[in-house]
């Protein structure tokens, strides 16, 4: 029954409205500093990329803001006719052989180019037409010979331009050439790393970082600056109805898109509204992994959570033993990635060894994933312990035995129960405790699986006691709400500091 979910949604709406009303204090001077920091990084990235593009493409002009021209650099080819290109591919029915043949027949290889001054306009890009009487018009016109650039670009046929990647399947075809989305660039970066293509790795890293910095400047720096009210507060809008899994999304700006981890400089601009106040973040430890351990009843996962096994150190050890030295911090990016559908494909051999090891180590999770797939095939839907249902009416089994929508089938139950059920019910519990104790400290945001509290300078110890009380009650709250025996420990870890970024663990 969805009765419990509806009740939780309605109850949470009240507390999200309170979060919006309270607002989150913003240091505008610090925000300007972050803007300058990102802008300087962006300028350097553009310079570095332009220098690298010059080496890869010769004098051929490339606009970094154009996905089409970026694809020229990456794939070293372009469609003969863009008008018919996108209609050539059916990613669901086209075989790999037909795809490769279609690409060969409908693209041309790009070569490095040499720029020579246009003799028609003498490099000015402008010409003056001649009147019938032989005199020149006073007004200039664009030179059509060089398209007003002042240069003619001549192919150097002995040197293919770009990184020379091949787009592997028809799903990589885009309207203007080939895909340059974030996930595709990450995949190609992994391939480049495997093949020792260091220049390609560096180029793709820079392109992805430039895209990220542009997003940070527009979505966060500009977004925060635009939506901060005259009282110096950003009133965080948290929405329950935009995501498939029920987890919260945001608007004006979407704070839920804030990168994970403790290094994102935008977090530094958020401070307490009180002089001497602090910001506390109560973060669930490995929440989605713990939920997956419970839902799958994987004995290894449950044992590791219960005993406090350091999974990140284990990840680092596996990858290092396979020949690629890796720190614990670096390993965090890999530890739970297989849980969300990531594989070793396109990664270094040492990293791929860990992804293979994950499947073997947590065989119970893998078995549960297969059970979910069978449930979706049989009923067209899957369920979570809270009563939420996810419909997959078009799910089928492919000829090779794999199941369509498998990534969503694996991810939705974990993400939904963790972030759409456990986090909200915990937020409500903590918010009620703060109010019941008539405290000025208040919840001002929640991102991913954390709860952010603006702590009054006289209430730090009281807030810590409330977080401790929540930890003691988490399992009881979850079990009582949904009639479960949640046999995996849940833990909120608190950090506190003068702003949202510069926080330290609370002993």
Task: List each model region and its residues.
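Short, contiguous acidic/charged loop-to-helix segments that flank catalytic cores in large enzymes
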Residues: 132-134, 220-229, 261, 270, ...
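Short hydrophobic beta-strand that contains or immediately precedes a catalytic carboxylate
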Residues: 64, 279-283, 492
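Function-dense linear segments that define catalytic or interfacial modules
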Residues: 237-324
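Catalytic palm subdomain of template-directed nucleic-acid polymerases
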Residues: 18-42, 292, 343-347, 451-469
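A common structural junction motif
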Residues: 469-481
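Conserved catalytic core of nucleic-acid polymerases
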Residues: 14-21, 122-138, 149, 174, ...
């Amino acid at each position: 029954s969805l009765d419990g979910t509806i009740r939780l949604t309605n109850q949470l709406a009240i507390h999200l409205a309170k979060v919006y009303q309270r607002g989150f204090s913003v240091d505008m001077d610090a925000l300007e500093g972050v803007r300058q920091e990102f802008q300087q990084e962006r300028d350097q990235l553009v310079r570095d990329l332009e220098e690298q593009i010059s080496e890869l493409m010769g004098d051929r002009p490339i606009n970094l803001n154009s996905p089409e021209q970026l694809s020229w650099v990456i794939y070293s080819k372009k469609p003969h006719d863009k008008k018919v290109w996108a209609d050539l591919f059916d990613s669901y029915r086209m075989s790999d052989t037909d795809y490769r043949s279609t690409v060969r027949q409908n693209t041309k290889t790009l070569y490095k180019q040499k720029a020579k001054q246009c003799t028609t306009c003498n490099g000015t890009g402008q010409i003056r037409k001649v009147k019938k009487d032989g005199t020149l018009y006073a007004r200039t016109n664009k030179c059509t010979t060089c398209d007003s650039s002042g240069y003619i670009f001549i192919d150097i046929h002995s040197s293919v331009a770009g990184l020379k990647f091949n787009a592997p399947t028809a799903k990589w075809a885009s309207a203007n050439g080939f895909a340059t989305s974030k996930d595709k660039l990450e995949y190609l970066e992994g391939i480049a790393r495997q093949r020792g293509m260091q220049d390609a790795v560096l180029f793709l890293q820079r392109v992805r970082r430039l895209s990220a910095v542009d997003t940070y400047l527009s979505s966060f720096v500009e977004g925060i600056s635009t939506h901060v009210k005259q009282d110096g507060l950003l009133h965080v809008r948290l929405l329950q109805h935009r995501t498939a899994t029920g987890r919260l999304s945001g608007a004006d700006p979407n704070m839920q898109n804030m990168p994970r981890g403790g290094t994102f400089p935008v977090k530094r601009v958020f401070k307490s509204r009180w002089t001497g106040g602090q910001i506390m973040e109560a973060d669930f430890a490995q929440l989605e992994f713990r939920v997956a351990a419970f839902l799958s009843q994987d004995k290894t996962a449950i044992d590791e959570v219960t005993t406090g096994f350091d999974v990140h150190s284990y990840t680092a050890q596996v990858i290092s033993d396979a020949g690629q030295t890796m720190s614990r911090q670096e390993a965090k990016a890999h530890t739970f990635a297989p849980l969300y559908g990531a594989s070793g494909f396109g990664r270094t051999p040492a990293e791929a060894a860990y992804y293979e090891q994950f499947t073997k180590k947590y065989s119970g999770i893998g078995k549960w994933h297969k059970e979910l797939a069978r449930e979706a095939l049989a009923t067209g839907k899957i369920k979570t312990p809270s009563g939420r249902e996810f419909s997959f009416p078009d799910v089928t089994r492919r000829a090779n035995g794999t199941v369509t929508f498998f990534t969503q089938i694996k991810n939705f139950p974990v993400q939904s129960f963790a972030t759409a059920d456990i986090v909200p019910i915990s937020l409500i519990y903590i918010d009620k405790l703060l109010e019941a104790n008539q405290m000025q400290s208040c919840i001002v945001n929640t991102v991913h699986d954390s709860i952010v509290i603006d702590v009054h300078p006289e209430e730090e110890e009281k807030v810590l006691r409330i977080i401790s009380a929540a930890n003691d009650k988490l399992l009881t709250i979850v079990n009582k709400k949904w009639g479960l025996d949640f046999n995996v420990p849940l833990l909120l870890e608190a950090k506190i500091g003068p702003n949202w970024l510069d926080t330290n663990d609370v002993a």
